[in-house]
């Protein structure tokens, strides 16, 4: 059974489902937080509709690469489905996770993506939800739901934003 996404080379949803509960248990035992970043590419359907699915695939691969380049080597990156990704960050509190999410959001949006099949470059942005395991008894489903809820708050607030679960939204910048 594959644990990596064949398109992007990062872990897949199955891997996260299998390993997140273990990481959470270690977090409780060590009393160190685990942060979850859940993000997706804003208006990704437009990329596919305008440039084709091949270009969409290139964008997904490059977003995965940029994500990996902006994280520590022990953070876990996974494609959760479609254009949605998850980052699991052990030993990371809410403030540190928010700072990493903002850096990632800015870096993805600042660099253009070269379109190999056309003489064009495109820019994409991402919206990010942040949640932190905040106590013994939290479940993987609960932390993922908090991250997902924060992600959708970021999207409802105009996209290209980071929102932390349980924290008032900070201005983009």
Model-derived features: positions:
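Conserved nucleotide-binding and Mg2+-coordinating catalytic segments in signaling enzymes
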Residues: 1-18, 39-53, 61
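Short helix/loop segment flanking the catalytic signature motif in cyclic-nucleotide metabolism enzymes
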Residues: 59, 72, 86-106, 143
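Catalytic core regions of nucleotide second-messenger enzymes
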Residues: 79, 108-126
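Alpha-helical scaffold within the catalytic cores of cyclic-nucleotide enzymes
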Residues: 64-65, 96-114, 148
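Hydrophobic framework residues that shape the active-site pocket
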Residues: 44, 63, 77-80, 85, ...
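Catalytic-core segments of nucleotide cyclases and related cyclic-nucleotide turnover enzymes
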Residues: 90, 98-101, 131-173
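Active-site-proximal structural segments of metal-dependent nucleotidyl cyclase/transferase enzymes
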Residues: 19-51, 67, 78, 97
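Signal-transducing coiled-coil linker helices
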Residues: 1-7, 14-26, 33, 75-76, ...
């Amino acid at each position: 059974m594959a644990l990596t996404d064949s398109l992007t080379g990062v872990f897949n949803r199955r891997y996260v489902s299998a390993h997140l509960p273990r990481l959470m248990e270690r977090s409780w035992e060590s009393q160190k937080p685990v942060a979850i970043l859940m993000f997706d590419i804003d208006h990704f359907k437009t990329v596919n509709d305008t440039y084709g699915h091949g270009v969409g695939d290139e964008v997904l691969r490059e977003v995965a690469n940029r994500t990996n380049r902006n994280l520590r080597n022990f953070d876990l990156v996974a494609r959760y489905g479609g254009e949605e990704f998850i980052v699991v960050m052990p030993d990371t509190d809410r403030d540190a996770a928010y700072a990493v999410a903002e850096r990632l959001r800015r870096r993805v949006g600042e660099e253009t993506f070269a379109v190999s099949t056309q003489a064009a470059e495109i820019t994409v942005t991402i919206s990010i939800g942040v949640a932190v395991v905040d106590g013994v008894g939290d479940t993987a489903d609960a932390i993922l739901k908090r991250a997902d809820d924060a992600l959708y708050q970021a999207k409802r607030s105009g996209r290209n934003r980071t929102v932390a679960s349980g924290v008032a939204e900070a201005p983009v910048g």
